[in-house]
Every structure is written in structure tokens, then in C-alpha cells.
């Protein structure tokens, strides 16, 4: 299956959104259709989602007005109601109770063969969205560049900017998740990629955001041999997770620190997150300093243990909508060379495709 790309160099936020919406019209229709079915599974009808979309757009406009304008442009270009696209950008908040199975490994330069920090993650999500995501390269008129792997119609997710700030993303669950909608985590990720010029700026932006859906956002940069830190955001407030003494940080889908840990629901909903964390930590501990390469880290994630304990997920034929978890993509972030590499599928079936701006133009 082809890796979908889109390149943007429009001068205005609205034009950027309109052009993307028109170019990705069919893919956006696919994505909004799947989420419509997922909303319905959670008891939300079209009127409920529209109301939540309006609420989300107001929150986005207050936090990042330029991204609110971009979302309005995406809606216009794709022929979708603006509240539908706003709700799509807040789908984590609307479906806050849904499970997810993403695994992240990040290493400081002391552990890698290149001597530079490295971030790797699997993105596990609904199989029905296998053709609903893309790699989006954005060149702003002031020279800033952002590359993000995201679902069509959503302004950002996992990514890298030209200043060497990389973001990885894992869903979490907290008992206080829920309405009213806070800053949508996908909008937060894009804002960080747009704005941050280093690890401190990224961490400050993430920690300051008032969210209503919990996530672990891992920041990886190449500053002074690498900076790696996960911010666990939740309605209870932020917490920070740093690498262990060997220079490795592993995160899955449960809180590791307070204040979020006291209200964690991820372990109850998917206890396999504990096993994934343990397996990844043990496999990384078996590697010596200076030995970690992208290939070695990817190989460590090719685990197919059952249920939510698998780091490389494949759906079963009889799995129902909402339960067909699949590793849709595997991502390698190398901040030292400003490169985000996206592999379609899981670690056991990767097909590489560089997401450099030059590749995105092709």
C-alpha cells in the first residue's frame, strides 16, 4: 500500500488548509466516516458530535488561532462541515475512553551507534484507518518546516521540525478524562512542532496546556548529546519522565509518574501495557552503550504476544469495529539529521519511506 504524502508551502493558514482539504478530500471522507461509526459505538449521534466539534473549535481558536483557521480551511477544501473537522481534531478527547496500544523507545546519544539521540514508536490504531493517514510536510513562509505523520484532516501528531525537535505520542487513560473539551492533544502536538526551537520550549508548551484527554508526549532533541523527556499530560496536571541511568526511556499506555498515576485507567482497560513496557525495557537493557541502531531498536519491538501485550499488532478476522487494533505505522525520529522516517505497518513488515521535504514533493 502506498505511503500517502502531502506538501504545503501556502502563505496563509487558511490556504494551507483549503489546499490540503481539496487534495485529500476522499481520504478525509474515509477518516470522518470511520470516526462517525466509532462515535456511534460510544453512544454519540451526529448532533452530539457537531456540538462537541463547535466546543473543540472554540478551544482550538483560543489556544492556537492559526490552527483554528487551518481547520476551517480543511473543512472548506474537503467539503466537510467545519464542526466535523474540528471534532476530528479532537477525536482523542471525544473518544477518551477508547483503548490504544502504542509503544515508544527513546535513547540518549550515549546509547546509540551514531552518538545522537533517537526516538522510535509504533502507532497502533483502528485497522479501518489503514488508508486514512499521511505524511505532511509544511513549509511556513518564515522558513520553519514541520513534518508530521497524521490522519487526513488532523493538523498534526507524531513529527519533527527543522530545529531538531521530535515528538512521539502514546494515549493514556485517567479517571478525570472527559468533558468539557480541553486543548486537543493533536492540536497541541502541531503547535509544539510549529513553535518549539528546543527541548525546553517544547516541554513548557506541553506542560502549560489544559487538556481533557491524557497522553504521553515524548520530546527528543539532539542538544548536547540528546535530550529525551516524556510529559504525561492529564486533567490532574503534567508529570515528567526522563531516561534511566543507561540513557533509555520506554513508555507504553499507562502513567509512570504522579499526579497522573493515581488516577490511571490504562492498566485496567489494557493490562498488556505493563508487559509491553517490561519487555521493551528488558530488550533495550540487553544492548550495550553505543550499540543501539534504528534497526536494532525496531527488531526489539517485533513482539506479537497476545492481546494488548503485543508491540506489533495484527487484527484477527473476527474482531469487531473498535477492536481491530493494528500497527498502522512505525516511526523513527533522528533529530541530529532532522529526519523522520515512516514505515507502513509494524516492525515485522516495514516498508521504508523518508519524509524529508524533498521526498514529500515527489
Regions found by a protein language model. Name each.
Residues 90-179, 183, 187-188, 328-331, ...:
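Internal mixed beta-strand/loop scaffold within catalytic domains of large alpha/beta enzymes
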Residues 1-101, 194-228, 235-236, 243-362:
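C-terminus-biased signal that marks the final domain/tail of proteins
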Residues 188-194:
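Short, well-ordered beta-strand elements within core beta-sheets of diverse protein domains
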